[in-house]
Swiss-Prot record:
Uppermost EC category: hydrolase
Gene3D superfamilies noted in UniProt: 3.30.70.240, Elongation factor 4, C-terminal domain (3.30.70.2570), Elongation Factor G (Translational Gtpase), domain 3 (3.30.70.870), P-loop containing nucleotide triphosphate hydrolases (3.40.50.300), Translation factors (2.40.30.10)
Pfam families: EFG_C (PF00679), GTP_EFTU (PF00009), GTP_EFTU_D2 (PF03144), LepA_C (PF06421)
Residues given in the record as GTP binding sites: 19-24, 136-139
Reactions catalysed: GTP + H2O = GDP + phosphate + H(+)
Location within or outside the cell: Cell inner membrane
Main location: membrane
Official protein name in the record: Elongation factor 4
Ranges of residues in domain tr-type G: 7-189
Length: 602
């Protein structure tokens, strides 16, 4: 395996928006090069999680090595590195792009360029990759390849005179793509003699062998007898095995510059072998690591609580296991008077949050309550100190703070221009600041807004899709913090604060949200033997209030006529009992109430 010259290697990835046919194209390439035999083939071969196949998205990166005999009768090694297309995983995308020399830009010939495609194309251009435009799904009746080519030229500025028309479904154009990969994508630089450096572009946790690391050798070579050093985590390991993905793992003795492979070295957790870290040799380490490494910081936080308190240890264990394979997931224990014991978790974004929640419920059989997602706020205290807070219920009282700052994102929304008005309305409702509007083609438009992240992480995406019949797509990145007139909205049930329902809202919206919350809770909390006040408050000021009337037992049913003082005595006794009950009684808020309110909160 090691006598391949570097000039015969091509490393490439596929860039595409969700649903533009990336995984199907990858399947077809694996099939046509004979990498995967027909009988082993299943749809979305590289998407290894069931959840990925169901949602039709790629979450974890995969890689596959293909042998291809080109028309010049030379045999080439093609390494396909799969990338996730979703904005939450953009750091993983940027690392896998760094492991390539070229990219196939796949655009759906019936839909055109979408937001995610653009975000990843710009990442690819920053990494100086050779980009080959591919128009997929040309067999569909609505496909208009020429119009889409024009769109690619206008929006991205790529020359599409040699773009390839293909249909991953029927197999049309697949041969042209393979030839283009060989002829147009440059081979890796020949740095076999340099000090060893390899880039980690993915890793996953295997319960038997520890963490399996996928890497691309940038310079030098790695032998299976070597001792390696990871430059960011400063840990060293003896190698157990190295190999290639074809696409099943296959052991080899050595990998050289330009090659892509995997290694196992009894690494305990994915956090020790982070995506973007540099592998070098322990005995002759490289001076500088490869550029661009950063730790992924969570942007969205929420509380996870088991519906059954006995499941708390299981939840902790499953989060520990998940973290072994998902280094971006952060969590710490949290308790709440209303929900009991649980965890405060941090995620890269909303999709990441949903996926973690779904994996916990599916793979570990847990039943969870998820509190409303929140973001990191910066609180300026009176003593000029700034603190970062990810849980609204821990924000200090108004007396001890000067102001609250919230994160803003710059958002680009791509959509057919007939939905312009509804989208602008949506952005304005969400406190967005209009920046620019560009016509991409005569009938497609880009809206650029600066908008608070907190308004995006709830249901912005769903709203955008439903108002545009699913045609709009969006892309956003963080641009910093801004001061706003924000307040902490508490909900008091029987004068006790319900932490999971605490939220940070803009002062102008506080009354409406508070009103909605107390009305919803009134419907959902069952009556008790005593009257329950439900209040929404900002600091010590109550802004909305409702009360649930008490259940009454008819204590006068035994009195037939007779003296009024007897009846008064019984009613007085009942009132006294209710008063004592109200002082001692605890209101159990049913879980459905929390769930319904969280939806409303969003």
């Amino acid at each position: 395996m090691t006598d391949i010259s570097v000039s015969k290697i091509r490393n490439f990835c596929i860039i595409a928006h969700i649903d533009h046919g990336k995984s199907t194209l990858a399947d077809r390439l694996l099939q046509d090069t004979g990498t995967v035999k027909q009988r082993d083939m299943q749809d979305q071969f590289l998407d290894s999680m069931d959840l990925e196949r169901e949602r039709g998205i790629t979450i974890k990166l995969q890689a596959a090595r293909m042998k291809y005999k080109a028309k010049d009768s030379q045999e080439y090694i093609l390494n396909l590195i799969d990338t996730p297309g979703h904005v939450d995983f953009s750091y993983e995308v940027s690392r896998s792009l760094q492991a390539c020399e070229g990219a196939l830009l796949v655009v759906d010939a019936s839909q055109g360029v979408e937001a995610q495609t653009l975000a990843n194309v710009y990442l690819a251009l920053e990494n100086n990759l050779e980009i080959i435009p591919v128009l997929n799904k040309v067999d569909l009746p609505g496909a208009d390849a020429e119009k889409i080519k024009q769109e690619i030229e206008e929006i991205i500025g790529l020359d599409t005179s040699n773009a390839i028309n293909c249909s991953a479904k029927t197999g049309e154009g697949i041969e042209d793509i393979l030839e283009a990969v060989v002829s147009r994508i440059p081979h890796p630089q020949n740095e076999v003699k340099s000090l060893t450096k390899a880039l980690i572009f993915d890793s996953y946790y295997d319960p038997y062998r520890g963490v399996i690391v996928y890497f691309r050798v940038i310079a030098g070579s790695i032998n299976k007898k070597d001792k390696i050093l990871l430059m960011a985590s400063k840990k060293n390991y003896e190698l157990d095995e190295i190999g290639i993905m074809a696409p099943d793992e296959k052991q080899v003795n050595e990998l050289h510059a330009g090659e892509v492979g995997y290694l196992a070295a009894s690494i305990k957790s994915v956090a020790d072998a982070r995506v973007g870290d540099t592998i070098t040799l322990f005995n002759s380490p490289a001076k500088d690591p490869l550029p661009g490494y950063k730790t992924a910081n969570p942007m969205v936080f929420c509380g996870l609580f088991p519906t059954d308190a006995d499941q708390y240890p299981d939840l902790r264990e499953s989060l520990e296991k998940l973290q072994l394979s998902d280094a971006a997931l952060k969590y710490e224990p949290e308790t709440s008077s209303a929900m009991g014991f649980g965890f405060r978790c941090g995620f890269l974004g909303l999709l990441h949050m949903e996926i973690v929640q779904e994996r916990l419920e599916r793979e570990y059989d847990l039943d969870l309550i998820v509190t409303a997602p929140s973001v990191i706020y910066k609180v300026n205290l009176n003593d000029q100190e700034d603190i970062l807070i990810d849980n609204p219920s821990t924000i200090p009282d108004p007396q001890s703070r000067e102001s609250i700052e919230e994160p803003y994102v710059k958002m680009e929304i791509y959509s057919p221009n007939e939905f312009n008005g509804t989208l602008m309305g949506l952005c304005q409702e969400r406190r967005g600041v209009f920046i620019d509007m560009k016509y991409i083609t005569t009938d497609r438009v880009t809206l650029i807004y600066e908008i608070p992240l907190a308004e995006v992480v709830t249901d912005f995406f769903d709203q955008m899709k439903s108002r545009t019949q699913g045609y709009a797509s969006m892309e956003y990145h963080l641009i910093g913090y801004r001061k706003n007139d924000l307040v902490r909205l508490d909900v008091l049930i029987n004068s006790e604060r319900a932490d999971p329902l605490t939220s940070i809202v803009h002062k102008d919206k506080a009354y409406g949200i508070g009103r909605g919350l107390v009305e919803k809770l009134k419907e959902l909390i069952p009556k008790q033997q005593f009257k329950i006040p439900i209040q929404a408050s900002i600091g010590s000021r109550i802004i909305a209030s409702e009360s649930i009337s008490a259940l009454r037992k008819d204590v006068l049913s035994k009195c037939y006529g007779g003296d009024i003082s007897r009846k008064k005595k019984l009613l007085k006794k009942q009132a006294k009992g209710k008063k004592r009950m109200k002082a001692m009684g605890k209101v159990d808020v049913p879980q459905e109430a929390f769930m319904a309110v969280l939806k409303l909160n969003q």
